[in-house]
């Protein structure tokens, strides 16, 4: 179920403060975050976030198509190693 429109998008407060601080300084540093639940705002476009996937930090560059989605969508948490091999011997 989607979030109610009247509530607005959820973003952790410290994340907005970090982005505004970087905008004032003019630097282009990576913003390290564990907040996979935060919605990407238009304010974030052009910044690179290091999003934690439970094991390591994945760099995510934010562009305009990502606005409105969550940071966690771009840092996969599971690694697919392929399906198990068939252990039965096939005879013809």
Curated annotation (Swiss-Prot):
Pfam families from the UniProt entry: Ribosomal_S19 (PF00203)
PANTHER family tied to this protein: RIBOSOMAL PROTEIN S19P FAMILY MEMBER, SMALL RIBOSOMAL SUBUNIT PROTEIN US19M
What role is this protein assigned?
Answer: Protein S19 forms a complex with S13 that binds strongly to the 16S ribosomal RNA.
> Example GO biological process term?
translation
> What SUPFAM superfamilies does this protein map onto?
Ribosomal protein S19
Highest taxon above the source species: Bacteria
Keyword annotations from UniProtKB, A to Z:
Ribonucleoprotein, Ribosomal protein, RNA-binding, rRNA-binding
Q: What is this protein called?
A: Small ribosomal subunit protein uS19
Record's GO cellular component terms = cytoplasm; small ribosomal subunit
